[in-house]
């Protein structure tokens, strides 16, 4: 039976690269594309070396672990020992979850089993042996996406709620600094784009918002013409439907900021996919905070060490 080494190598190179990318997304690591591709190439070398006199070494677990060390080092570099092991263990986790998921789905579709010498052999009509290209190319990205979303959900659940954080809102090239409260009760999102909405007191924004826009935020239902909005702010205005206790559906005036920056657990988190909703109610009687932070912002933002 002919073996298409180039196709096998290309498949492994692609899978190793996607696993490293998934690792970077989960840990929110910054990476360069050429380093990511080189890391995937290092992992795929095992396939090529399997067809050399060194093939007996390539099947040894120690060699495979050594290759994974070099893959992670090439992709993310080395800053300190903890940084390296976080990357390495997350890479193993992604490999086991996605690889195990593929194997589980593969065996789910098996309809023929044969027991030989106390070993189970399977036959896979239409799926290839053991797993067809189409099965891998479709299933692998889907399982990667599923794994990433599940990890994000776990991270949101583990966030310490009712915690005050420093917040900077960059809006129309102006920066506002304030305190924010991470509140699990704030699950408001734009229904069209699924963009999370943080709530900010109107008093915190009055220094930079035009008077007409501030008046409109008090009674959004009165909006009738686009001319009511200053053209400088028109592209930043959004209307988000929401429901409060004892009241019917209402509209909240929200703004699209240039960026929101949070300081959470010694990390600076920068978020661009966020809306700033304007509230005319008092969020904190003792004025401990001026905004309510959507918990998802902690997960979706770009993280860097706080200076």
Curated annotation (Swiss-Prot):
Organism: Priestia megaterium (strain ATCC 12872 / QMB1551) (Bacillus megaterium)
Transmembrane segments: 7-27, 36-56, 57-77, 89-109, 127-147
One GO CC term on file: plasma membrane
Domain of life (superkingdom): Bacteria
GO term, biological process aspect, one: sporulation resulting in formation of a cellular spore
Primary site of residence: membrane
Annotated protein name in UniProt: Sporulation sigma-E factor-processing peptidase
Record flagged with keyword Ribosomal protein: no
Subunit structure: Self-associates. Interacts with SigE. Interacts with SpoIIR.
Catalytic-site annotation from UniProt: 183
Locations listed in the record: Cell membrane
Signal sequence region: none
An MF annotation (GO) of this entry: aspartic-type endopeptidase activity
EC number: 3.4.23.-
Family: Belongs to the peptidase U4 family.
Role description: Probable aspartic protease that is responsible for the proteolytic cleavage of the RNA polymerase sigma E factor (SigE/spoIIGB) to yield the active peptide in the mother cell during sporulation. Responds to a signal from the forespore that is triggered by the extracellular signal protein SpoIIR.
Cell membrane found in the keyword field: yes
Membrane topology note: Multi-pass membrane protein
Gene, per the UniProt record: spoIIGA
This protein's UniProt keywords: Aspartyl protease, Cell membrane, Hydrolase, Membrane, Protease, Sporulation, Transmembrane, Transmembrane helix
Disulphide-bonded residues: none
């Amino acid at each position: 039976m002919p073996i298409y080494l180039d196709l096998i190598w290309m498949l492994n190179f692609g899978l190793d690269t996607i696993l490293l990318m998934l690792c970077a997304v989960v840990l929110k690591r910054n990476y360069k594309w050429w380093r990511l591709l080189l890391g995937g190439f290092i992992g795929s070398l095992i396939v090529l070396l399997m067809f050399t006199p060194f093939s007996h070494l390539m099947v040894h677990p120690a060699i495979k672990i050594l290759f994974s060390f070099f893959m992670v080092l090439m992709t993310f570099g080395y800053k300190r020992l903890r940084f390296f092991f976080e990357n390495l263990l997350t890479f193993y986790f992604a490999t086991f979850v996605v690889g195990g998921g593929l194997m589980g789905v593969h065996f789910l579709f098996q309809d023929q089993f044969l027991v030989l010498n106390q070993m189970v052999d399977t036959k896979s009509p239409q799926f290839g042996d053991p797993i067809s290209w189409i099965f891998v190319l479709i299933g692998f990205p889907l399982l990667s996406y599923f794994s990433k979303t599940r990890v994000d959900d776990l991270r949101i659940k583990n966030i310490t709620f009712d915690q005050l954080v420093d917040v900077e809102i960059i809006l129309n090239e102006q920066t506002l600094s304030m305190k924010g409260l991470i509140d699990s009760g704030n699950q408001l999102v734009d229904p069209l784009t699924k963009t999370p909405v943080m709530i900010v007191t109107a008093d915190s924004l009055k220094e930079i918002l035009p008077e007409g826009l501030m008046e409109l935020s008090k009674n959004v239902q009165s909006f009738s013409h686009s001319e009511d909005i200053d053209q400088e702010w028109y592209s930043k205005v959004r209307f988000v439907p929401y429901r409060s206790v004892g009241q019917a559906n209402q509209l909240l005036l929200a703004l699209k900021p240039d960026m929101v920056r949070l300081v959470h657990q010694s990390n600076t988190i920068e978020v661009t996919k966020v809306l700033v909703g304007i509230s005319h109610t008092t969020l904190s009687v003792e004025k401990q905070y001026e905004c309510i932070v959507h918990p998802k912002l902690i997960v979706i933002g770009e993280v860097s060490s706080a200076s």
